[in-house]
A protein has these predicted regions:
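…; additionally, a secondary subgroup of soluble metalloenzymes is captured
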Residues: 1-330, 338-374
């Protein structure tokens, strides 16, 4: 059985104990730096120029590492401390990360963290340091002036579902949103409040007849952000649909059949978008009204076309139900107005397996109390 004796006495004071220690050799640790440099040279034949503090930290972090790892450290090709990994650990579990870290490693780690966020180093509890880091990241996202390293850390945080609860806490404790410009923020930002502010600014711009290209470009970037999936407003894509919608192909509609095809293929998405905005903003009529106005303009063009064609309507659907029910296979019959047709069409377009559809006509369209075509 192997036994290790540890003592702080000099060799001359060990007396008979030295005989036991010398059985397998005596390791003198009163000069740890010299000991590490000597054994490192014996192992890899490299005289490293690492400063003492960094060398000691490397030794403490070397457990489980290979000689190739040590070669990279000794030659200055790699840093002994994986700051990004340790920072992710800190953000995910501040208290346990600090508790399990050697005090010398913690000191160098915190120095590198403060350098990364561009702030003077101060003594902080782990939880406060973690919030300080996230506040720096949020500041960079809000101003769209964030370093590549901090943006990478943020993306790693948003991609980890086990950090969702921690991220929600960090976001809730961030207090510098009041003066933020929603159009200047990085599109990956995690603030639903900025999406609401953007909606209100766009509403005001529509009401005043302003140029909207800058808004739609930003909204498009926000919609496409994969990192903001859990944080952005679901209705942003509906805002884009309403603002950009044009009845460009309506002039080609020459029959009721053309009209039905046009509605399903082109106009139904606008009805869907407005329905989603009503669900989200119906109690904020002031901000919703300009978007409703855009919708009503497009709807009027659609209804004008319908009434122009309806006078030529001739019944052509006698026996339609009997004909369809006589077919083989499973048949679904939906009796609905245009609003429900729009919902059904949305579901149909999202279905993986497309089935054949036939549509019957009502005599006249209707308009709901909120102005939706039906």
């Amino acid at each position: 059985e192997k036994v290790v004796f540890y003592t702080q006495r000099s060799n001359g004071e060990l007396a008979f104990l030295l005989e036991y220690a010398e059985t397998q050799g005596c390791i003198v640790l009163d000069d740890m730096e010299t000991y590490i440099r000597k054994h490192l040279f014996d192992a890899i034949q490299i005289n490293t120029q690492l400063p003492k503090a960094e060398l000691l930290v490397a030794a403490k972090l070397s457990k489980g590492k290979s000689l190739n790892w040590w070669k990279g450290i000794a030659m200055g090709l790699n840093k002994p401390m994986e700051t990004d990994k340790l920072l992710m650990d800190l953000l995910a579990a501040p208290a346990s990360t600090a508790k399990n870290m050697d005090k010398d490693v913690w000191k160098i780690f915190t120095a590198e963290v403060f350098a990364m966020i561009g702030k003077p180093q101060t003594e902080q509890p782990a939880e406060v340091l973690a919030q300080t880091v996230m506040d720096a990241i949020f500041d960079g996202l809000v101003s769209n002036q964030i370093s590549a390293s901090l943006l990478s850390i943020y993306h790693r945080c948003t991609s980890r579902h086990d950090m969702d609860a921690m991220m929600a806490d960090y976001i809730a404790r961030y207090t510098r949103l009041k003066e933020a410009d929603p159009l200047k923020a990085h599109p990956d930002h995690p603030f639903l409040a900025l999406d609401h502010a953007l909606f209100k600014r766009l509403s005001h711009a529509i009401e005043n007849g302003e140029f909207l290209a800058g808004y739609t470009q930003y909204i498009d970037a926000r919609i496409q952000s994969r990192q903001a999936v859990s944080y952005k407003a679901a209705w942003l894509k509906d805002v884009k649909t309403i603002v950009e919608f044009k009845n460009g192909e309506l002039y080609k509609v020459a029959s009721l059949q053309d009209f039905a095809t046009y509605y399903r293929a082109h106009f139904a998405v606008l009805d869907t978008a407005v329905r989603h905005l009503y669900a989200a903003w119906l109690h904020d009529e002031k901000w919703l009204r300009p978007f409703q106005y855009l919708y009503e303009q497009a709807e009027k063009e659609l209804l004008d076309k319908w009434f122009a064609l309806a006078k030529d309507y001739q019944p052509s659907q006698q026996g339609l139900l009997k004909e369809k029910l006589s077919g083989k296979g499973r048949i679904a019959i939906l009796v609905c107005d245009g609003l429900r047709l729009e919902i059904a069409e949305t579901i149909y377009q999202q279905a993986k397996s497309k089935k054949s559809n036939d549509y019957a006509f009502a005599m006249l369209p209707s308009v709901t109390e909120n102005g939706m075509s039906a």
